[in-house]
């Protein structure tokens, strides 16, 4: 499957997130089980801008990390192009998170995620987000897939 085939309808099938927590608008590049590049159009309409910060809206760093994690989820689930019913993608660790540039409304946030390894049910990713080709955030992410509690 190519990046062009992963449109918003496919993203909604692969990720359980919905507004206001869906933070991936588009897949730009995709190599199954290797890497993914995604896009988030950051708008003033995001609910977190109401309080972060009034008069000086800045995208919270944890939301950038969440956008990277959702991109990692697409990379994992995207290999099969389906998410099993009830499967959820959980963070199990974040290492080396660094925030290097502020993200404002109107910015296009590009998320780049690469698989580092998969061992005993834990995925490890190298991830970074850019705005205008400048790194805004970088981190190593560790995630696992679990069935939701019934």
Swiss-Prot record:
SUPFAM superfamilies: Thioesterase/thiol ester dehydrase-isomerase (SSF54637)
Gene Ontology BP, a term: lipid A biosynthetic process
E.C. code: 4.2.1.59
Keyword Ribonucleoprotein listed: no
Keyword Membrane: no
Any one GO molecular-function label of the UniProt entry: (3R)-hydroxyacyl-[acyl-carrier-protein] dehydratase activity
Superkingdom of the organism of origin: Bacteria
Catalyzed chemical reaction(s): a (3R)-hydroxyacyl-[ACP] = a (2E)-enoyl-[ACP] + H2O
CC terms in the record's Gene Ontology section: cytoplasm; membrane
CDD domains: FabZ
Compartment annotation: Cytoplasm
Keywords noted in UniProt: Cytoplasm, Lipid A biosynthesis, Lipid biosynthesis, Lipid metabolism, Lyase
InterPro entries assigned to the protein according to its UniProt record, in alphabetical order: FabA_FabZ (IPR013114), FabZ (IPR010084), HotDog_dom_sf (IPR029069)
Active site: 52
EC class of the enzyme, as a word: lyase
Pfam families xrefs: FabA (PF07977)
Protein function: Involved in unsaturated fatty acids biosynthesis. Catalyzes the dehydration of short chain beta-hydroxyacyl-ACPs and long chain saturated and unsaturated beta-hydroxyacyl-ACPs.
Family: Belongs to the thioester dehydratase family. FabZ subfamily.
Protein name: 3-hydroxyacyl-[acyl-carrier-protein] dehydratase FabZ
Organism per entry: Cupriavidus pinatubonensis (strain JMP 134 / LMG 1197) (Cupriavidus necator (strain JMP 134))
